[in-house]
UniProtKB/Swiss-Prot annotation:
Signal peptide: 1-25
Subunit structure: Homodimer, non-covalently linked.
UniProt keyword terms in alphabetical order: Cell adhesion, Cell membrane, Cell projection, Cytoplasm, Cytoskeleton, Disulfide bond, Glycoprotein, Growth factor, Membrane, Pyrrolidone carboxylic acid, Secreted, Signal, Transmembrane, Transmembrane helix
Keyword check for Magnesium: no
UniProt-recorded name of the protein: Kit ligand
Gene Ontology cellular-component terms listed: cytoplasm; cytoskeleton; extracellular region; filopodium; lamellipodium; plasma membrane
Organism: Bos taurus (Bovine)
Cystine crosslinks: 29-114, 68-164
Length: 274
């Protein structure tokens, strides 16, 4: 009985080991992002609205896929956040500006390190160099949030590796706002007409949905099959051991009956001798 339980437990652990690597496939650097990014809203509220933060902005963030600008953008965010950190004193309060910025710098530095590890696999360089600009806290951390969100889907977006070239007919870039929504990414604007641009955007959206569905299927199917195989092995082993258990119980009952008969015969002989 103990051997059967041990085998079932082994099957369960085997399923967990097979399933665990599959649940971490989305986002090559998403595990570097901690919950400290949620303090961005508090930081924006603490800073003056007219305070200007210098950032070398990568052109094309609003019209190019994230793999075209994320590598350079995260490096520039690291520089700007470090400069911003130097302007605040080291206050021990948990939610002070210094502590929040310090945590954000650590997150961005980890992302820079991760991007260096995957620089040749999933990212490209923009065709234009970053441009120094001045941003209010709301706009600056809107760019920060968009960059952080881009890491969560970087593996999906980078799978097609489209060219990182900004069309000459691209519209002016819109201001980024602090938001927790997914990054809003458009394909390169076509030079022909607005109608062609709309159709290409629709195709991009449908392809993204199909990619997400395919990835979930790739995760769910192996997990399902490993679960079925694990239970099949467990059932087979239990069925194989069941006859042995039945024979063991029968032999035990026979031995008990033989012992009882022997005891009765022994008592009968003792009675006859008396």
């Amino acid at each position: 009985m103990k051997k059967t339980q041990t085998w079932i437990i082994t099957c369960i652990y085997l399923q967990l080991l097979l399933f665990n690597p599959l649940v971490h496939t989305q986002g090559i650097c998403s595990n570097r992002v901690t919950d400290d990014v949620k303090d961005v809203t508090k930081l924006v509220a603490n800073l003056p609205k007219d305070y200007m933060i210098t950032l070398k902005y990568v052109p094309g963030m609003d019209v190019l896929p994230s793999h075209c600008w994320i590598s350079e953008m995260v490096e520039q965010l690291s520089v700007s956040l470090t400069d911003l950190l130097d302007k605040f004193s080291n206050i021990s309060e948990g939610l002070s500006n210094y502590c929040i910025i310090d945590k954000l710098v650590k997150i961005v530095d980890d992302l820079v390190e991760c991007m260096e590890e995957h620089s040749s696999e999933n990212v490209k360089k923009s065709s234009k160099s970053p441009e120094p600009r001045q941003f209010t806290p709301e706009k600056f951390f809107g760019i920060f949030n968009k960059s952080i969100d881009a890491f969560k889907d970087l593996e999906i977006v980078a799978s097609k590796m489209s060219e990182c070239v900004i069309s000459s007919t691209s519209s002016p870039e819109k201001d980024s706002r602090v938001s927790v929504t997914k990054p809003f990414m458009l394909p390169p604007v076509a030079a022909s007409s607005l109608r062609n641009d709309s159709s290409s955007s629709n195709r991009k959206a449908s392809n993204s949905i199909e990619d997400s569905s395919l990835q979930w299927a790739a995760v769910a199917l192996p997990a399902f099959f490993s679960l079925v195989i694990g239970f099949a092995f467990g059932a087979f082993y239990w069925k194989k051991k069941q006859p042995n258990l039945t024979r063991t119980v029968e032999n035990r009952q026979i031995n008990e009956e033989d012992n009882e008969i022997s005891m009765l015969q022994e008592k009968e002989r003792e009675f006859q001798e008396v």
